[in-house]
Amino acid sequence: MSSETLYDKIWDLHRVAEIPGGSTQLFVGLHLIHEVTSPQAFSALNEKGLSVHCPERTIATVDHIVPTTSQNRPFPDSLAEQMLRTLELNCLKHSIKFFKIGSGNQGIVHVIAPETGLTQPGMTIACGDSHTSTHGAFGSIAFGIGTSQVRDVLASQTLAMKKLKVKRIWFDGYLQKGVFAKDLILHVIQKLGVKDGVGYAYEFAGPAIDGLSMEERMTICNMAIEGGARCGYINPDKTTFNYLKGRPYSPKGKEWEKAILWWESLASSKSAIYDDEVRFNASLIAPTVTWGITPGQSIAIDASIPTPESLDKNDQQIALEAYKYMDLKPGSSIEGIPIDVCFIGSCTNGRLSDLEKAAEIAKNRQVAKGVKAFVVPGSEKVAQDAESQGLDTIFEKAGFEWRKPGCSMCLAMNPDKLERNQISASSSNRNFKGRQGSAQGRTLLMSPAMVAAAAVTGSITDVRKLLH
């Protein structure tokens, strides 16, 4: 009986050659590119007179720098316009499929690839973006890469990588009402730390994971990188197959039946050997909010901000830095902290089900006075589906702004930015200093439903109090 994990199986299937020094040349099945990390890579190709090795395995979109109010061209920001134009020209020159604004397929790269069926089990996927691990939710091995590696994949369709160890994170029980996938992954990162996963791939498994939708699973894998892991994945199952069936790039007819048989064979063997394993009880997890300046600095909504003495010595210095930057007192409650801005969106939580959960809280309520709240769908398809359900109307009646697709305030490489020392409740993935556009801006990460709760109450609020 095989003792291989899914990671082992996919690695072996995509191994091209061994490289002196311990690295492996790995074939990349799908390469996703965008406007920020691709220009220099294309320039390097052009300088050497090289062409893209597998344009049919390369897909482009624009997401990081696009404005979310009006997306009429040219963009007011000349640099953003130049970056988009450069991507358009590079895609045209190298015959790369480009999901442009208005195509119906444009959006955040980690939202559009799954929803179009491009992301499939058994693939190796690379993208010049940290949160490429999102695609591991489908039983693929997905890596974020740097610009020089984007160049390498464009030129050779391969990457030089060292094989990771595999850590299984098992979840017994099930999430309680008002607790979501975002709470689960924030809880894991808080317990294990932001460096626990260095050198590892995380395999997420157990009854709690089995019970999640694909969109919830994507949230989990999206933030594996925040725990230090190079990638995170979930074994493919019926939930995976049901999600993929009928999508534009999914296999059709007899090929679909063949694909399912193959995908099922990729799941980690029952006798698989892991390098490490840890267990959690999902039923004990509460709505979770970050209080500091790393995704690992989080607490349950009904808990108090930790005191330095209660922390491990290795965590005390960053905690002292966080208290000062966030202007929060150790021992104080996270609930009740006033909020200036509420952002719902990102590759972590900008999908239809995320917006549905937030809309449930916003419905028949009003955004609190003095709070700016806005919703940014993760893609044009998400926006279209949400609008067909009337979610845009629910949000707008409540006082939220309904925006156009893009990365938006997750990273503030576009007009959506915090000002001065504003505090934001955000459904994104990083709360680093200055992450949302202001050197003094403060970010508290939470689920979309929790963001909506903060918007209508004006402060951090336990969403369970607002559920019908």
From Swiss-Prot:
Gene Ontology annotations of biological process type: L-leucine biosynthetic process
UniProt-annotated binding residues for [4Fe-4S] cluster: 347, 407, 410
Cofactor dependency: [4Fe-4S] cluster
Pathway(s) per entry: Amino-acid biosynthesis; L-leucine biosynthesis; L-leucine from 3-methyl-2-oxobutanoate: step 2/4
Alphabetical list of CDD domains matching this protein: IPMI (cd01583)
Keywords: 4Fe-4S, Amino-acid biosynthesis, Branched-chain amino acid biosynthesis, Iron, Iron-sulfur, Leucine biosynthesis, Lyase, Metal-binding
SUPFAM superfamilies linked to this entry: Aconitase iron-sulfur domain (SSF53732)
InterPro entries: 3-IsopropMal_deHydase_lsu, Acnase/IPM_dHydase_lsu_aba_1/3, Acoase/IPM_deHydtase_lsu_aba, Aconitase_4Fe-4S_BS, Aconitase_4Fe-4S_dom, IPM_dehydratase_rel_enz, IPMI_cat
Job of this protein: Catalyzes the isomerization between 2-isopropylmalate and 3-isopropylmalate, via the formation of 2-isopropylmaleate.
Alphabetical list of PANTHER family matching this protein: 3-ISOPROPYLMALATE DEHYDRATASE (PTHR43822:SF9), HOMOACONITASE, MITOCHONDRIAL-RELATED (PTHR43822)
Name the UniProt record assigns to this protein: 3-isopropylmalate dehydratase large subunit
Organism of this sequence: Prochlorococcus marinus (strain SARG / CCMP1375 / SS120)
Lineage: Bacteria, Bacillati, Cyanobacteriota, Cyanophyceae, Synechococcales
UniProt gene name: leuC
